[in-house]
A protein has these predicted regions:
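Bacterial Sec-dependent N-terminal signal peptides
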Residues: 1-27
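Generic hydrophobic-segment detector
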Residues: 8-11, 50, 122-123
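Start-of-domain marker
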Residues: 28-58, 66-68
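Beta-strand-connecting loop/turn residues
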Residues: 39, 69-70, 140-144
Length: 144
């Protein structure tokens, strides 16, 4: 019985170590850049939710993607680095990244607000926004 218990804990320890030793992969050139696509993105010291927060990135912020392990390690334009969940950025090629940076933007100046599907506050909410968020200008159709 003691052997079985020891074997179980040995197996559990090995399984835990293998999960922690995830393969770190540098990003291929066609997705080594990205843009944050949530209003406030928590950047963490390690690629896990329980890790401490190192800084934050805002919607529309262009970032460099350094590596991927299930989480992205990113670098902001002001050279901060941290880990973000894979669902909070849109990875892209250098060409798309440069296109994003050249595009005309709208910068949110209110403390908090919303974007809508149509130019009507009763239409479906697309996202919340906070001061400093950057949105690509798509034109003024339907706006007064």
């Amino acid at each position: 019985m003691k052997k079985n218990i020891l074997f179980f804990f040995y197996f559990l320890a090995m399984a835990t170590l293998s999960l922690k030793a995830q393969e770190i992969r540098p990003m291929p050139a066609d997705s080594a850049y990205g843009v944050v696509h949530i209003s406030v993105c928590n950047m963490r010291e390690e690629g896990k939710f329980t890790s401490g927060m190192s800084t934050q990135a805002l919607l529309g912020m262009p970032v460099k993607v350094l590596q991927y392990t299930g989480w992205y390690e990113i670098q902001t334009p002001d050279d901060y680095t941290g880990w973000v969940h894979r669902m909070v950025i849109t990875p892209m090629s250098k060409e798309k990244y440069d296109e994003w940076n050249r595009a005309e933007k709208i910068v949110v100046t209110s403390h908090y607000g919303f974007t809508y599907e149509k130019p009507d506050a009763t239409s479906q909410t697309v996202s919340d926004v906070v001061a400093g968020n950057r949105l690509k200008w798509e034109g003024g159709k339907g706006h007064s």
